[in-house]
Amino acid sequence: GGWVVDENNTPTVDTPEFKAAMQEYLDLYALGSTLDKDDIVASVTSGETALAQIWPGWYTPTADGPANYTTIPTKLTDDSAPVDAVALQGVWCIGIPDNAPHKDLALELLEYVMSPEVQLASIENNGVPCRYSCLTDSTVLETYPHLQTVCGALETGVYRPVIEEWTEFTNILGTEMDNIIQGTKTMDEALAYAQEQLEQLMA
């Protein structure tokens, strides 16, 4: 894999690292079709799938179920190369906009939603708590041991770039990646164009 922006949020998609990651994706894509979310969850639940990469909120393992969680390995070799995190965190952020008309009420809501009591209660409804205390609570882990794995992934994972233009960024890059997959552009053509468009977006 590779970063799509550098430390200054300058796009870095027309690079050898991104091209290598894209080629790896193409090789995987050629092995078979992908499933949508509901089909992935159904195949995991039924035990038909040997391995699936999913968001924790999609599937809750049970004691007698056919599947369980494991953290994606951070390294597959035993050489001396540095260990890089490979788990990607989806960024679900809650905040109060500057132009919010009722900031005091919004703050009260946030304090309620983020309270330990509400976060613990969310687990019983297949929620994934965002409080460390909930993910490491020994009583919780007795019933929901998979949350220990979730916590481990959160500790070793990396977050998407924190950029205001993320939606537009992924639309531009995703369109050009699809052009590569469909064969309407070469990888060099598509990524050079994506780089140009993304640089304009981030300027």
Which residues does each PLM region occupy?
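Extracytoplasmic/periplasmic substrate-recognition and gating elements
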Residues: 30-34, 63-128, 184-185
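Short, well-structured alpha-helical segments that form the helix of a local strand-helix-strand
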Residues: 44, 187-198
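Long, aromatic- and glycine/proline-rich binding clefts that accommodate carbohydrate-like moieties
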Residues: 74, 123-175, 179
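Soluble non-cytosolic domains of exported or imported proteins
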Residues: 12-19, 38, 100, 104, ...
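Periplasmic solute-binding protein
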Residues: 1-8, 88-97, 169-178
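Paired acidic/hydrophobic, glycine-rich loop segments that form the ligand-binding mouth/hinge
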Residues: 50-55, 70
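Short helix-initiation/N-cap motifs at beta->coil->alpha
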Residues: 34-46
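Glycine-centered hinge/linker elements that transmit conformational signals in sensory
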Residues: 7-37
